[in-house]
Amino acid sequence: MYNFDKVIDRSGSDDLKHGALLPRWGRDDLLPLWVADMDFETPSFITDALKARLEHSLFGYTMEPEDYLPSIIDWVHDHHQWDVKREWIRFIPGIVKGIGLVVNVFTRPDEKVIIQPPVYHPFRLTPEGNGREVVFNPLKMKEDGYYEMDFENLEKIYDEKCKILILCNPHNPGGITWSKETLQRLADFCYEHHLLVISDEIHADMALFGHKHIPFASVSDKARNISLTFQSPSKTFNIAGIVSSYAIVPNEEIRRKFYPWLSANELDEPTLFAPIATIAAFRKGEEWRKKMLAYIEDNIRFVEDYCREHIPGIRPLRPQASFLVWLNCRDLHLSHDALLDLFIDKAHLALNDGEMFGPGGEGFMRLNVATPRSILKQALQQLEKAVAQL
């Protein structure tokens, strides 16, 4: 019923993954496996819902459909065992935009934001772009290649100017589903130090290999009272171009400060198609989601097997969530420039450079495996050939 092996020609769609190759890398002959969207068709139950609305020829001002908030509430309850109330939820115009909004509402220009690199680069760029200092609490790499939070260092780098900690849960690029114990410990620290937590949970519905996502706000009363959770169906159902993000804020005091500000600036009003796509995804998407995740798991196994047999100098870290694979290339013993030259000019691949994710990302590349296996095989063959010439 669902064909994830089908290769889709994305030309003519103005997609970023292909369209930005020339301005970003100076060449457009690269196989793009960088931008975190899928090369799979957006499922038909979403496109059918959008087409049905398009058949009505009037596109004036609209209200949220009646089932918009209930569809979110039911999905979060069924998948994450978290009971969310209607008044906790508001549409936001994108998760990165939401981070910028929170930074502006809850901090002054002389205050600081804590992030834990290597991590999704807008966590640094957005606060810095808004004139806030970003403080690093780098994750610690364990012997197995996975990461853990460094709570001792967190205590050291904290000062009273720190007002927000941005959490990536699940973690990008490491693909980590943080344990309940880790999240509780983080909540205890942030509560005691009066830190507001923004929990980016855009990959929440993409847990893999038996792992489970745990919403930060669900782990304790402390977590619930200091956090804003940002979620979206965009990654899971490949609708990033339809802005469909939302905030979940259990604490009334935080809501009273943030939501009226959103409303005053009309930033909590979803575009026409966002609720339609969200409802379709959350009401009809479970079978597709499971099959998609199974395909992603097989793609990850394919990368692992291929690297082990043909490119042993590159060690993929198996993600516990998401379709992003963190490639450890340090055994190649290449400088940063030489590593980029290997992937771009020799293998003709466009991946995300590990250094863009901050301290700890050196010697890594991020690979998007949400693509037909034939494309993934081609990419690995090109990489194998390039590495063999080192």
Predicted regions and their residues:
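N-terminal small-domain helix-loop-helix segment of the aminotransferase-like
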Residues: Y2-V96, L101, A281-F282, Q389-L390
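Conserved core segment of the aminotransferase class I/II
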Residues: D48, A52, D221, N225-E297, ...
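Conserved PLP-anchoring active-site segment centered on the Schiff-base-forming lysine
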Residues: V105-P127
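A short helix->loop->beta-strand "cap" motif at the edges of active sites that frequently abuts
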Residues: E111, R132, E192-L195, R224-N225
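Active-site phosphate-binding strand-loop segment of PLP-dependent enzymes
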Residues: L139-H211
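PLP-dependent enzyme catalytic core of the Aspartate aminotransferase-like
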Residues: E155-K156, A223, H333-S335, L342-L351, ...
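Conserved glycine-rich beta-strand-loop-beta hairpin in the small C-terminal domain of fold type I
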Residues: I279, Y295-E304, P316-C329
